[in-house]
């Protein structure tokens, strides 16, 4: 007699998503040996559907690679076409539908002159803000996003 109880629901793989920690330098604040300190600003997005502040991210289109998903989602949500940098880490949490979700993040930087490019609100994101890391941590809605950014501030990006 088997002691394994069958479940009514099939096993679901975690929901995959990818995004970016987009940074831009602040003029005149650079110091050798520091990575993510007040000399940089980080972009956060406000999503009206959830009334939350988060890092730009989203789900893949079909079999899209995570790196490509991250770049596309950052551009869709912020209007910034960025260069992909080092992997930063991942967050794991339960989404609003009770599913496990894993989001992989990469460091990204917009091209020179992106500061002057105007953001155009859309149905997913109605506001973006550039903030120094400490202020960004304070504004982020979710603990997993705050922990990721705080860890990055302490250690810098992961080495491949």
Placement of each model-derived feature along the sequence:
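Conserved beta-strand and immediately adjacent loop positions that scaffold enzyme active sites
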Residues: 19, 41, 127
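Short, acidic/hydrophobic/Gly-rich beta-strand patch recurrent on exposed beta strands
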Residues: 43-46
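Unchanged
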Residues: 58-147, 151
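Short, charged, intrinsically disordered terminal tails
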Residues: 154-160
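Acidic, metal-coordinating catalytic segment for phosphate/diphosphate chemistry
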Residues: 1-34
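Extracellular/periplasmic catalytic domains that process cell-envelope and extracellular macromolecules
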Residues: 36-37, 99
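A short gly/proline-enriched turn/hairpin at secondary-structure junctions
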Residues: 54-56
């Amino acid at each position: 007699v088997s002691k394994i109880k069958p479940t009514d629901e099939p096993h679901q793989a975690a929901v995959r998503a990818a995004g970016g920690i987009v940074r831009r330098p602040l003029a005149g604040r650079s110091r050798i040996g520091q990575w993510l300190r007040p000399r940089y600003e980080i972009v956060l997005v406000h999503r009206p559907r959830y009334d939350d502040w988060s890092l730009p991210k989203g789900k893949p289109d079909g079999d899209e690679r995570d790196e490509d998903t991250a770049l596309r989602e950052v551009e869709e949500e912020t209007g910034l076409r960025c260069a992909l940098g080092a992997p930063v880490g991942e967050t794991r949490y339960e989404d609003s539908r009770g599913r496990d979700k894993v989001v992989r993040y990469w460091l990204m930087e917009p091209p020179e002159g992106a500061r002057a490019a105007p953001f155009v609100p859309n149905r997913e994101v109605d506001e973006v803000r550039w903030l120094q890391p400490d202020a960004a941590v304070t504004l982020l809605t979710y603990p997993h996003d705050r922990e990721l950014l705080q860890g990055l501030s302490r250690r810098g990006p992961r080495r491949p």
